[in-house]
Amino acid sequence: MDSNTITSFQDILQRMSKMQLESSSVDLNGMITQFERLKIYRDSLGESMMRMGDLHSLQNRNATWRNELSQKFEEIRWLIAECRNILTKTENSFEQITFLQALQLLLEVESEIRTFSFQLI
């Protein structure tokens, strides 16, 4: 994985963990959890591309893998919608910067996962 992506994930997660949004901390904690899961999934998918044994294993369980991939894209879409929703409501510049960066990162990760998935198919 690109070291900039790792740094971006860590930076955004650290910033989000310090925030107290007006909506609720439960929503923010849910977003943080989803970001962490997405990072782990993206890392494991990238590592699978580097190991041929894992690549063949993924191809052998193709139906399950496609369902997992579909679920991850749903999670990404949910996170994008949540970031956009927060951006429309907040006037705090720290929150705006954080969620704009989170939105950009989500779009980059979605693109990377699509690229990996096309290579695995």
UniProtKB/Swiss-Prot annotation:
Q: What is its main location?
A: virion
Name the encoding gene, please: NS
The record's listing under InterPro entries reads: Flu_NS2 (IPR000968)
Q: Where is this motif: Nuclear export signal?
A: 12-21, 85-94
User: Known Pfam families for this protein?
Assistant: Flu_NS2
The GO biological-process annotations, alphabetized, read as: exit of virus from host cell nucleus through nuclear pore
Tell me the compartments it is located in: Virion; Host nucleus
Similarity remark: Belongs to the influenza viruses NEP family.
Self-association state and partner proteins as the record states: Interacts with protein M1. May interact with host nucleoporin RAB/HRB and exportin XPO1/CRM1.
Q: What does this protein do?
A: Mediates the nuclear export of encapsidated genomic RNAs (ribonucleoproteins, RNPs). Acts as an adapter between viral RNPs complexes and the nuclear export machinery of the cell. Possesses no intrinsic RNA-binding activity, but includes a C-terminal M1-binding domain. This domain is believed to allow recognition of RNPs bound to the protein M1.
GO cellular component terms, alphabetically, are:
host cell nucleus; virion component
Q: Does the keyword Transport apply?
A: yes
UniProt KW keywords:
Host nucleus, Host-virus interaction, Transport, Virion
- State what protein this is by name: Nuclear export protein
